[in-house]
Amino acid sequence: MVQDRLFQKAISVLLIAGYEVSERCAIRPRSFDLIAEKGGLLLIIKVSSPIDNVSEEIARDLDLIAGHLEGSPLIIGGRARDTDLERGAVYLRYGIIAINPETLYDYLVDGIPPLVYASPGGLYVNINGDVLRGLREQRNMSLGDLGAVLGVSRRTISKYESGMGTTLEIAIKIEEVFDSGVIESIDLLKYTSHFANKPQERLPVQALAVLERIGLELHALRRAPFQALATFEGEMILTGYGTAQKVVKRAGLIGNLSAITHTHAMCVAIDGSIRKKVGQTLIIGEEELHDIEDGEELIELFD
């Protein structure tokens, strides 16, 4: 019930903000639940409460999908362990931003970005180090002078000016001292991957060999409704595979996701001879793939 309410809140906020929202992904396993798009901006969204349920495996999928679709991964939740997520605060789960629906509303609808982020020990803010240094120098204050006023060391002030975050309490003191803003807001749509040397999953040998033979580059996923992202000369294909019965069930959802992300959708049936379109999705048998000469010929089948 809690999860359903979160879904409804998240979808409502996205629609109010003018986003086109995909169907809810109800297929298990799933690394994301929704994809939303507005003016070329893509959000890959996982709804989870508590946010601790988002595993590293799920986060890696979110990261990989966001990277290749040039989107921003986002976790929408209500709690972290036994604590409610605070409005206007950002939480991190394996480097993926997590917020509550109210913070999403403030950002997307009212244009109010969050200012604080949660970290062990409490809530923190980012300080604009260049602004802080400029204000300090205008007052002819040394690092030690400002440190004495704030009750911290000169080395800590130096770190603030180099970009280190601080507690909300200290940041407020700084702004009171200079009567000027130094706190930097957090851009929810600015994402930098925290995963290095991402392990590549291998697709089943036959499907992998056929698609690679015709020149496609493949990126396997573990928990998405499509098992791979395939690329060919700038064209992206959301690719699923499995028995004919299985891929027909997934074809509609994968097609809907491809429409939102402005990509192609393909399902490879490994147990039959078939080639047809179901909505946006090309369903093709593995045998038919063997007859395709190259990636360009495959792309033409989507038209």
Swiss-Prot record:
It comes from the Archaea. It holds the Pfam family HTH_3. Keywords: DNA-binding, Transcription, Transcription regulation. One of its GO terms (molecular function) is DNA-binding transcription factor activity. Disulfide bonds: none annotated. Residues 132-189 form the HTH cro/C1-type domain. PROSITE patterns: HTH_CROC1. The keyword Endoplasmic reticulum does not apply. SUPFAM superfamilies: lambda repressor-like DNA-binding domains. This is Putative HTH-type transcriptional regulatory protein Mpal_0031.
